[in-house]
Amino acid sequence: MTPDHNETVPATLTVHLDRPLGKINPFIYGTNIEHLENLIYGGLWGELLDRRKFAGHDGGRLPNRGRRRDRGLAGPWRGEFTDEANFGLVAPWEPVNPTDQVFFVHDNTTFYSGSQSQRIDLLAADDDYHGIGQDGLEIATGTDYVARVVLQIEGAIDSVVLRLRDAKGENGRWNLLPDGPAGDFTSYEGTIRSERSGPASFELVARGQGRLWVGAVSLMRADVAADGGLRSDIGAKIVASGLKMLRWPGGNFASDYFWMEGIGPLDRRPTRLNRAWNEYEPNDVGTHEFLDYCERLGMAPFVCVNTGSGSVEDAAAWVEYCNGPSDSEWGRVRAGNGREQPWNVHYWSLGNEIWGDFQVGHVDPETYAQRALEFAAAMKAADPSIHLTAVGHVRNVLGRWNELVASAVSGQVDAIAVHYYNLNPAVLAEEPPVQDKWDALVAGPKSTAAVLRDTIEIIDRHWSADLLPEISYDEWGIREDLRWAPGWKELYLLRDGLNTAGTLQEIQRLSGRISMSHQFGFVNRLGLLDANPNQINETPCYQGFRLIAAHSEAIALETESAGPTFDTAGLATEPPLEAVPYLDAIGTLSEDGARMAVSVVNRHRYDAINAKIVISGGSTAATTATVHELNGTDALAHNTYDDQRQTWIETREQELNVNSGTIEYVFPAHSATVLELPIDA
């Protein structure tokens, strides 16, 4: 692209009402909810405390203290002959008011959850409180927090306090009366009301002489806890975005996830080191939490089973747990956990990216195909009505993966999965020039479409059943290089929002074959939203997704774009492209034929484009249109928690310039627009 400022160049868009490309399955508007970094824990899930069930190493063995950064890895001893003050304390917990009369043990003999508790020995009574705490919390003013702790107490402990502290001192407390029976774990729940906002720490401290075992502890905003722990404010953004399907629990995480550990009482569920991401999984968000959340939001669940380290029997049992009647073996267990009626989960995936050598349970294509057939048979025996997706790859790489898998599972599964991301700049030695990155990303949907078409052709060629498989494009997005990203989080710009909108337009063009697609992932890492415990920030990618998903109609139409083009040089994993249209457009038509939406991405960083919109095979007498426009203060604008008016979607009614049945419309530079129009009967 040439940086010519403030020019207006001409183009022509032709929308063919009489050339449908296919009916758009609403499940192309999906996203991934994976247990990865702070997508769920620290994002969707309202728990504020890390390592709340005290699994893992003590502080003396961690090279990386901090919230969710150590990823479960043991480090070298810091001191071979001297214990540090945090020895025996599970990281990231720290001692509060330590003395030589306070002793910490990660106790593997007496525990409540999993195989470990946190023990605090107060060897002598004094007037001070001693115990454990962790920092890194963000607290809101005048907010109630529900605190819950599971304790076993021995000896003369006369007072237990759970409190918040900040730079000014105490910021709310709950004085717990430890009246449980001696020798047993007892669960206590109370409320802490904060007085100030800002960074804070949480402390659990006791006074007296004796011993405390802390089996589990929790701190959650009261409004979030009342909603079941998964945040309603993020849920509202999910609904508003036009999303229709949530894929869970992964992603790579699924290849080492054991669903039976994620049911039953929260504090009893064990913590496991998930090998996919080397992160401790507390199992607080399990089957009930996810499926109830989907039900509450009106989302279809898409559940990925563990074909990496899991068994056929576990997968079949999971189907029965979700879908079986309450008098079936696993239906009775479900009912015992509080859910009498089945959820009737229809969409299931037979693993995730098992072709990758990074994946737990990685195998060759023929072995996976056999494994997929075994899983499919067992799961269909539990519920013959379910829809199954097998793991595919792009084109026919990795030992002819798609060829061998498609030919083996043909007719036994319903869909083949494809994953493909734009850019993946980790192969670059340094951050590329701004214009090169702009070109690669705004044109990225074109390279995506080429990969998808090539992949579909290969799968179809080796599929022997009469009915061709559906394609589930169930991971896509923009891989930003975190070496240059602030806070180990991708910084998505308006440029990336145009990529997101353009990718959905390409998926709509392939609606005859793609039945599901899932952007990765919704919150924080690779997310459409940024979220901390008290705030949400809409990225331009969220706005680009919402623009298309919330305002498109049901049938994709053949649409042509004639006008100025540009070439790209290629960048990272993006190939060089020639003659990429500045205007990318697709029309969609309502099922009754009464309404049309024309969505248009102007990829030009600097210039507006004056387009003539020709409606072929029909007409509109409209003189005004409802316009939804994504734009920003500049081409590289982005929102922050404190300033969310740098990019936006503006909705307005606008008069149209109609000349001889052709609509003229000026699409601003670096924008994405949807025009909603009535169609003449």
Q: Predicted regions: what is each one?
A:
Residues 567-580, 601-681:
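C-terminal beta-sandwich/jelly-roll accessory domains of carbohydrate-active enzymes
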Residues 218-227, 269-283, 300-309, 351-369, ...:
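The substrate-binding groove and active-site-proximal loops of carbohydrate-active enzymes
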Residues 27, 35-36, 468-584, 593-594:
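Aromatic/acidic polysaccharide-binding cleft in carbohydrate-active enzymes
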